[in-house]
Amino acid sequence: VMRINFIVIAKENGTILWEWRVATSSIPTDKQIWFHNPSEVKPVYNSKYLLVTASGGAVALIRIADKKVMFYAYAGANPHSAELLPDGNIVAASSTDQQISIFRTDTLAGTGKAVETYPVSAAHNVVWDRMKNLLYTTAGNYLISYEYNFDKENPALVNRNEVYRLYGEGTEGSHDLFPVYGEYALYWTTNGKIFKYDIVSDKCSIAYDIKEIKSISSGPDGIPTLMLQPTESWWSDHLIDPEGNILFQKQNYKIYKARWIIDNTFSYPPIHLINE
């Protein structure tokens, strides 16, 4: 869960288990503004690390155990999401400059710059498909894929392809793209609805007729689907399930995205270790 300018791991009952604040981190003072308004928080490497972005420009990989920032970089104007590639390199999506950027993740130097950028209309999301070795992102109402060159030292995205296009009412304004737990499918949220794209059948259906969902995260049986629907501007102090029931609430929180701490085998192998 992200609260204004810091990141927390919490129980549903509101108990805070862990938090990370840039002000008390190793990030240089002049770079801390990059971490203003966190915008993504993906559990990676068997939920031992968090891959985060912030609207101020940051992308970062943070180790949960000791809160160490393993790598950080400037990822453009208003980053909304990031993804790990199989070799540990990172891709980030930034919406204001409408691009995705690729980084060589140098955990020895601890920082770096984008190796290359690629234009993507209103870029808001990036998801790796480990079965097909494809990177997905949305561009307007299109689902786009890229291939990766698997060159860790000189990473590049190639062979852009338009995979699927949404038509009709409620399809404008793509926002979150995230794997459906236990399925070979993606949740795809827009200004008007939540769609589910089935990769095998290449078909898209309406999963939930709910507007303005900024983040969605599902889990195994017994774990409700977690959503953020703004109640003020882009944020809310609570998270809901598809029926609108409040799953988590914290007074004065300005939450933008939330993810269950659950291994994501759509994007990463069951045993997923960082190469430091």
Q: PLM features: what roles do these ranges have?
A:
Residues G170-D241:
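Loop/turn-rich, solvent-exposed surfaces of beta-rich toroidal or solenoidal domains
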Residues I102, G110-G112, T117-E162, H175-P179:
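Solenoidal tandem-repeat scaffolds enriched in leucines and small polar residues
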Residues I9-W34, R63, K68-A75, K113-E116, ...:
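Aromatic (tryptophan-biased) beta-strands that constitute blades/sheets of beta-rich domains
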Residues N46-Y49, D87-N89, M131-N133, G182-Y184, ...:
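Short coil/turn segments that connect the beta-strands within blades of beta-propeller domains
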Residues T29-K42, G76-L85, V120-W128, G168-Y181, ...:
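Repeated scaffold domains used in trafficking and secretory/extracellular systems
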Residues A10-G14, R104-A109, Y146-L157, I199-I206:
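Short loop/turn segments immediately following beta-strands, especially the blade-tip
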Residues V1-R3, V44, L51-G56, A92-T96, ...:
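Conserved beta-strand positions in repeat-built beta-propeller and related beta-rich domains
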Residues I4-I7, A58-A60, Q98-S101, L143-S145, ...:
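Structural signal for beta-propeller blades
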